[in-house]
């Protein structure tokens, strides 16, 4: 398979003397916050898992010394509650799972085997207009 290169942008990297850890931060804007399902969504978390894995590899840092967080920037929240930290754990098992998912995705892309997101398709039937491919020749 062909070699692939990725470019990612970590919004903020902070070293804390207090806990002697590097904190990788990704800003997310939202109106009010996230529901618990979104906070625990593994695919969403994989973004930070990849950041941690590749940051540790590039800078030769022990992954145990890196913590990851989404910071929700809430547009409609009350003053003093406009930001919320959502910690994302990225232990060995989750990192292995994320890297396996990436390998599988790259394999399918290289084979031009594009997999339909049937969850989004099911939802779009109830909310007409949210999927640009709904009821077209591209909707399988």
Segments from the language model and where they lie:
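Metal-dependent nuclease catalytic regions and adjoining charged, substrate-binding loops involved
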Residues: 41, 53-140
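Non-catalytic protein-protein interaction segments used by genome-maintenance enzymes to assemble
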Residues: 1-48
């Amino acid at each position: 398979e062909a070699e692939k290169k990725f470019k990612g942008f970590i919004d903020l990297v902070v070293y804390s003397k207090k806990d002697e850890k590097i904190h990788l931060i990704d800003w997310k804007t939202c109106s009010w916050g996230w529901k618990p399902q979104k906070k625990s969504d593994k695919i969403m978390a994989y973004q930070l898992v990849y950041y941690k894995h590749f940051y540790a590899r590039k800078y030769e840092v022990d992954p145990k010394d890196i913590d990851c967080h989404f910071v929700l920037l809430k547009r409609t929240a009350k003053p003093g509650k406009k930001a919320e930290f959502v910690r994302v754990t990225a232990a060995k098992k989750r990192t292995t799972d994320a890297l396996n998912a990436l390998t599988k995705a790259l394999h399918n892309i290289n084979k031009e085997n594009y997999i339909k997101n049937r969850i989004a398709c099911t939802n779009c039937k109830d909310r007409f207009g949210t999927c640009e491919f709904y009821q077209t020749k591209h909707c399988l």
